Amino acid sequence: MMARPVDPQRSPDPTFRSSTRHSGKLEPMEATAHLLRKQCPSRLNSPAWEASGLHWSSLDSPVGSMQALRPSAQHSWSPEPSVVPDQAWEDTALHQKKLCPLSLTSLPREAAVNFSYRSQTLLQEAQVLQGSPELLPRSPKPSGLQRLAPEEATALPLRRLCHLSLMEKDLGTTAHPRGFPELSHKSTAAASSRQSRPRVRSASLPPRTRLPSGSQAPSAAHPKRLSDLLLTSRAAAPGWRSPDPRSRLAAPPLGSTTLPSTWTAPQSRLTARPSRSPEPQIRESEQRDPQLRRKQQRWKEPLMPRREEKYPLRGTDPLPPGQPQRIPLPGQPLQPQPILTPGQPQKIPTPGQHQPILTPGHSQPIPTPGQPLPPQPIPTPGRPLTPQPIPTPGRPLTPQPIQMPGRPLRLPPPLRLLRPGQPMSPQLRQTQGLPLPQPLLPPGQPKSAGRPLQPLPPGPDARSISDPPAPRSRLPIRLLRGLLARLPGGASPRAAAAAACTTMKGWPAATMTPAETSPTMGPPDASAGFSIGEIAAAESPSATYSATFSCKPSGAASVDLRVPSPKPRALSRSRRYPWRRSADRCAKKPWRSGPRSAQRRNAVSSSTNNSRTKRWATCVRTACCF
């Protein structure tokens, strides 16, 4: 029949209902146990009664007892089902300590009297509730015996409170005579009366000016002892502290119904679960954070690879710069595959380097190590030069290093030995030399040992193949800039052609150039296969000259022209660019969303505005991304 112990801060009612239920049936001893569990009621039975030999709640108009009860209820009292009575009293005393000075000094007389009213009513009602005959109210008779000085009448209940707790502390026991089961029973009743808080005040009960039929002796004797106690109490105060302060440290959370042992138990910081309280969590921030950080990482990282992946999907398969090229189709003989032997680190001869394009039949003159590197990348016959990264006019011919960012262009001696006919030897070269990324060819294009010219996928693909993936972002812009600078001068034939077409077409040069060069877009996608001249030609039939000039697929053109058209660069860029931009946008999204969510949280301000803006932003972002 344990009533749940009540938490200090919580108003006692709910629990007490249960106690009310039981208290009628309690055996004397049980009653005592019960009292031990709830400090309040037991606080009633205190040495004061031993003095009077009678039970406060019944004798002295219940005020005293009620007084004792109520404040204790209001101030938290420790609910621990104190198996050790000592401890329990300790706690009570602790709270009392807070109460005493206050109530003694500040509580006005009226308040005390008021209490007396209320408490009397309560007691009476409780006794009726209990219905046990012994408890029927001893009607307080105005006994002339009892004329305490009014101030004493006021002060007494309050003082009694303090002193009771003191007494209990000193005695070290529950301070009610174990011998009087009846008393303990009644005190229980009193407690329950307080718990079932009837709002009714019976007018019948007189204010406490007189004590109910009890001898005056107890109260007369009482004040002396009380005052002593009060005096000592101030000195003793430090002693009241509960024996192990740790138990006091965690106050139970406000609404909690758990047993104190739960909230008092030492807690590892990890066990504490996040609370809804505004205070910062007990749990360490590191514990929450790493996941967040990791998540964001996951967000950001894939985006980088995805960038390159998407672009290969365009039908070319440039490998990330450092990576050795993947082996072409399984069906292809592997040996031919390393057509670019390690020696040709610049895998794809840039068109600008004049490399003799070997027809399939030719044995490829493999550059001797002494050969300067730029010429060195001898285009394998199978590969039209177009795919090779065409050095844009501004660029030195060393694009190959760009191609293989990690690898210095160094010519392994074995390289020169390789002949197109010797399939095995190329393979060996490859193994002997650095593992070169093999020329980036679309996987579909087998590099046959003979290296017959393999029809490459359409020019744009080839071009993008040879594009070094790495520096892509800044390079094209630089190149375009260089190209534009060249345009007026017509330094390179290709540039001249471009200038010619732009002027011939009647497009203002300005419009054309921005279109080609807009860093974001690159040349319009329509132009994918063609050099500037070709674009122009396609767009206006009148531009025949430019068309004739540059209409051959730019690959061929670049072969002849010393300066390869920059366009392919730009072009691959253009096709690359729209999605690349969107990827950037997406990549930024998580970062933006971090602060954004914070704003969302913080801006309790104009909700409409915020939401509208937010919604708009979201729409835009989504639309642009995809």
From Swiss-Prot:
Segments of skewed composition (Pro residues):
366-399, 436-445
Kindly list any coiled-coil regions of this protein. Answer: none
Give the quaternary structure: Interacts with the N-terminal region of the XLas isoforms of guanine nucleotide-binding protein G(s) subunit alpha.
Cite any additional comment in the entry: This protein is produced by a bicistronic gene which also produces guanine nucleotide-binding protein G(s) subunit alpha from an overlapping reading frame.
Protein name according to UniProt? Protein ALEX
The protein's topology relative to the membrane is: Peripheral membrane protein
- Signal peptide region: none
Functional note: May inhibit the adenylyl cyclase-stimulating activity of guanine nucleotide-binding protein G(s) subunit alpha which is produced from the same locus in a different open reading frame.
Where found, per UniProt? Answer: Cell membrane; Cell projection, Ruffle
Q: Where is this region: Disordered?
A: 1-29, 173-223, 236-473, 556-612
Report biased composition (Basic residues) as residue ranges.
570-579
User: Which GO CC terms are listed, alphabetically?
Assistant: cytosol; membrane; plasma membrane; ruffle
**UniProt gene name:** GNAS
Pathological condition linked to this protein in its record: GNAS hyperfunction: This condition is characterized by increased trauma-related bleeding tendency, prolonged bleeding time, brachydactyly and intellectual disability. Both the XLas isoforms and the ALEX protein are mutated which strongly reduces the interaction between them and this may allow unimpeded activation of the XLas isoforms. ACTH-independent macronodular adrenal hyperplasia 1: A rare adrenal defect characterized by multiple, bilateral, non-pigmented, benign, adrenocortical nodules. It results in excessive production of cortisol leading to ACTH-independent Cushing syndrome. Clinical manifestations of Cushing syndrome include facial and truncal obesity, abdominal striae, muscular weakness, osteoporosis, arterial hypertension, diabetes.
> What are its GO biological-process terms?
adenylate cyclase-activating G protein-coupled receptor signaling pathway; bone development; cognition; developmental growth; hair follicle placode formation; platelet aggregation; positive regulation of cold-induced thermogenesis; regulation of signal transduction
Q: Where is the composition biased (Basic and acidic residues)?
A: 281-312
Biased composition, class Low complexity, residue ranges = 337-346, 416-435
Family indicated by similarity: Belongs to the ALEX family.
Question: Where does the protein principally reside?
Answer: membrane
